[in-house]
């Protein structure tokens, strides 16, 4: 009788152990499947790796999409600092704060990121793939003050850790340049895409650097050497409060981003009162309602 009970207990124990091991295996399989399942990257994207100080740190997490390298925001940030993340569903933006002093704001579908007062153009928009924000790597590297190079033989991005705190210094734009550049961009290109507004800002700054024009933003805008250069000066709209997007575009231009270092003119062919530019200057490209010329 006792032997029979012992056998029954052993049988129940074996069945329990088998069920337990089966459950553990199932849970492990599900966990591994979740970990191994890839993000639903867009068609045409190509995987690439990211190295930090010679070590592979992002393997299989990054892709080149439309000729731009995208990295997962959270994983990239945590490479350099102990960061906190706060998601705002209303604005579709993530606020990242690092112990090194960085405040970073990244908004889904935006073409720029905010970092300690700076506005860095991303070229490609911030993407949301499978519930995670992916950001072009170059502006993120600038935000963390990280050196970045492209290794053609490896077809990978190589990063070098910052010597100091992993955070760009707080922005300090020239107040006069920002004041007038944002106003001319807004007066000339309000309602245009951010890229179109940046291009107008590029024209002004390219003239500042040219020997053929005054060497200040204010001087270029109010230049009357060959007549009024910008119609908002005549209409008085240059003095209007600029649109928020124009202020951002001006800051991006002052960060040094340019669509072209050669463009010196632009016009809206639909409303232009003169075709001198189109007849005398080489055409460069069109963005929105504006044609740009060298």
Predicted regions, residues:
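Primary recognition of N-terminal secretory signal peptides and signal-anchoring hydrophobic helices
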Residues: 2-182
């Amino acid at each position: 009788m006792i032997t029979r009970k012992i056998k029954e207990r052993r049988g129940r124990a074996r069945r329990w152990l088998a069920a337990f091991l089966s459950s553990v295996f199932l849970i492990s399989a599900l966990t591994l499947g979740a970990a191994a399942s890839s993000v639903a990257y867009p068609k045409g994207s190509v995987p690439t790796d990211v190295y930090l100080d010679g070590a592979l740190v992002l393997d299989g997490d990054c892709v080149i999409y439309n000729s731009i390298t995208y990295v997962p925001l959270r994983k990239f940030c945590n490479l350099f600092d102990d960061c906190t993340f706060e998601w705002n569903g209303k604005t579709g933006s993530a606020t990242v704060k690092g112990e090194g002093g960085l405040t970073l704001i990244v908004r889904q579908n935006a073409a720029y990121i905010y970092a300690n007062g700076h506005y860095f153009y991303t070229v490609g928009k911030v993407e949301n793939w499978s519930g995670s924000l992916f950001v072009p790597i170059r502006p993120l590297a600038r935000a963390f003050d990280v050196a970045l190079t492209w290794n053609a033989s490896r077809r990978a991005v190589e990063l070098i850790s910052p010597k100091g705190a992993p955070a760009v210094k707080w922005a300090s734009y020239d107040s006069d340049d920002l004041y007038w550049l944002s106003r001319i961009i807004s007066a000339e290109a309000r309602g245009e895409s951010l890229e179109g507004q940046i291009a107008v800002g590029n024209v002004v700054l390219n003239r500042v650097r040219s020997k053929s024009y005054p060497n200040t933003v204010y001087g270029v805008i109010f230049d009357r050497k060959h007549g009024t250069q910008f119609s908002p000066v005549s209409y008085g709209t240059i003095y209007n409060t600029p649109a928020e997007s124009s202020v951002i575009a001006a800051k991006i231009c002052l960060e040094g981003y340019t669509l072209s270092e050669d463009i010196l003119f632009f016009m809206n062919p639909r409303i232009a009162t003169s075709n001198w530019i189109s007849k005398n200057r080489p055409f460069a490209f069109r963005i929105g309602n504006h044609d740009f010329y060298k």
